[in-house]
């Protein structure tokens, strides 16, 4: 038997995709670009002294809905949903993760368009 435990940020995203039937379980290959908050995606990124292009999620759902393990990590562009659920930063090594329960986690689960899309996919799957 497995005892209940708190999910990490990556496990939470993967679980929502799995339950909604949208998770792509393919192994290996090129990194995916999952959808992130639009306000963060449209922020200008500075690359080598110039402004880089805005972040774009993969256009095909099966590409962007791969496991979080395969998501490309851009150091200057953090995924706010995963950051809210204590994903470690890209700048330092992480021996141990923090387990903080904070109000923004509940607000993210209630108000995020990405999570709302997973809930709609689950509802459509159950019909």
Question: For each of these PLM feature ranges, what is it?
Answer:
Residues 1-127:
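An acidic, gly/pro-interrupted, aromatic-rich
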């Amino acid at each position: 038997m497995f005892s209940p435990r708190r999910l990490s940020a990556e496990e939470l995203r993967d679980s929502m995709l799995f339950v909604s039937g949208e998770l792509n379980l393919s192994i290996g290959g090129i990194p995916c670009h999952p959808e992130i908050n639009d306000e963060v995606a449209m922020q200008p990124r500075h690359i080598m002294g110039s402004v880089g292009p805005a972040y774009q999620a993969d256009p095909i759902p099966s590409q962007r809905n791969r496991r979080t393990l395969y998501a490309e990590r851009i150091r200057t562009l953090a995924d706010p949903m995963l950051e809210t659920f204590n994903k470690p930063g890209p700048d330092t090594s992480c021996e141990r993760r923090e387990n903080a329960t904070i109000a923004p986690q509940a607000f993210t689960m209630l108000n995020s368009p990405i999570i709302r899309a997973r809930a709609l996919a689950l509802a459509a799957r159950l019909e």
